[in-house]
Amino acid sequence: MNKLFITLLLLVGCSSNPIVDNTEQITQWIFVANEGNFGASNGSISMINNNDEVYHIEEVGDVVQSLEVYKDKLIVVINNSHVIKVYDITEDGLKLPGIEISTDNSSPRELVVVDDKVYFTNWNTKDVKVLNLFNYNIETSIPVDG
């Protein structure tokens, strides 16, 4: 009886079909802000994929100050150009040219994104502005000291 059980187990338990992984590999990106030289408009973005291939988006603006990934978007603060650029992230990198939002000469610096709103600090205007990511309008300005 044991021999019969072991024989059946071996016949049923073995498969000649190899296991195939049908999942697609999704490209993941690391984004690096390259500030550039003040006044030279040569700030850039480096993109590194999960194969360690490096790509560059040149001449993004004058002083690429900071950036952040939020959902399927890359949000880039460009200080001396006084703009924020928003790019869609795709499998191939960034969808260019992106959307450019003027900050009205505020010299934006750092950002954080909460609930589809970008809160960014400003050197010239000494405030925190709030950018709505649905309509790309600056909704409000919050004065701060310093």
Please identify what each model-predicted range represents:
Residues 1-2, 15:
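N-terminal hydrophobic targeting signals that begin at the initiator methionine
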Residues 14-146:
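Predominantly soluble domains enriched in secretory-pathway, periplasmic, or organellar proteins
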Residues 4-12:
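Sec-dependent N-terminal signal peptides
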